[in-house]
Each structure stands twice: as C-alpha cells, then as structure tokens.
Amino acid sequence: MAVPKKKTSKSKRDMRRAHDFLSAPGISTCPQCKEPKLPHRVCESCGSYKGKDVVDAE
C-alpha cells in the first residue's frame, strides 16, 4: 500500500490547492429587457434569445 514518506507541509498543500477555486460566471445583459443573464442562454425575464422570442415569459 502506498504511504507518503514525508508529511506534506501546509505551504505545499496550499500551493497545490491554489488553482482549485471556482471562477465567477460571466454575466451579460439582455439586449431587449436589459436584465442580467448568462451568455449563450435564454433570458430568464423576457424569454428571448438572439433577438427572437423563444420562450413565453410570465
């Protein structure tokens, strides 16, 4: 069974974990209703995508 020969220090552990964070999603604005939305997705508030009404919004 594989066992580490030396204890991993807090510095080495934290340097390894430096890239494990989640990045914030890019937020764009809807050109029709000016609400914030995720790119390449239908707008939640007005239901439009690429200038066309795709989904009936409530």
Swiss-Prot record:
Gene Ontology MF terms in the entry: structural constituent of ribosome
InterPro entries, A to Z: Ribosomal_bL32, Ribosomal_bL32_bact, Ribosomal_zn-bd
UniProt key word Ribosomal protein: yes
GO BP term (any one): translation
Compositional bias (Basic residues): 1-16
One Pfam family matching this protein: Ribosomal_L32p
Keywords: Ribonucleoprotein, Ribosomal protein
The organism's place on the tree of life at top rank: Bacteria
GO cellular component, one term: large ribosomal subunit
Keyword Methyltransferase: no
Region (Disordered): 1-26
NCBIfam families xref list: rpmF_bact
Family matches, as PANTHER family: 50S RIBOSOMAL PROTEIN L32, LARGE RIBOSOMAL SUBUNIT PROTEIN BL32
Family: Belongs to the bacterial ribosomal protein bL32 family.
Name used for this protein in its record: Large ribosomal subunit protein bL32
